[in-house]
């Protein structure tokens, strides 16, 4: 399979990148998400406060994710849910797997990595020092 743009991660950054790429004229886009729904961490953020700047009203995380998911669907781009990326090579080849295709390869002209993050204690990062420069937890960034 060949694609002009592959976006790995269907959370807020991945969906936003997909919509922005489509608006800039790219049409051959594939969005890969390992979970069964788009939205990433937004699905866990049940408090209000999202969407005020983008949509002009306060939304919960799942509501905000749903709005962005609708924008992605309106583009008609290909979205693969329940798809795990196993490897990304220096030649812009992606090895991925899902239940319907098994293990498969995608050749991309460009790749956007939008996989999000998980919070871990500083000791589990194996980086010396009290806090790695430029790395912030999701809680700190809020």
Residues covered by each model-derived region:
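FAD-binding core/adjacent interface of flavoenzyme oxidoreductases
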Residues: 1-8, 66-142
């Amino acid at each position: 399979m060949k694609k002009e743009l592959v976006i790995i991660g269907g959370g807020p950054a991945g969906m936003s990148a997909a919509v922005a790429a489509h608006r800039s004229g790219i049409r051959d886009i594939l969005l890969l998400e390992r979970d069964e729904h788009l939205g990433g961490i937004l699905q866990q953020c049940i408090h209000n406060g999202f969407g005020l700047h983008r949509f002009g009203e306060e939304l919960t995380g799942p509501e905000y994710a749903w709005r962005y998911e609708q924008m992605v669907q309106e583009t008609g781009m290909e979205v693969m849910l329940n798809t795990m990326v196993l490897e990304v090579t220096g030649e812009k080849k992606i090895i991925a797997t899902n239940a319907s295709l098994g293990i498969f390869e995608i050749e991309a002209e460009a790749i956007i990595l939008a996989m999000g993050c998980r919070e871990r204690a500083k000791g589990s990062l194996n980086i010396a020092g009290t806090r790695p420069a430029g790395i912030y937890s999701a809680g700190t960034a809020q």
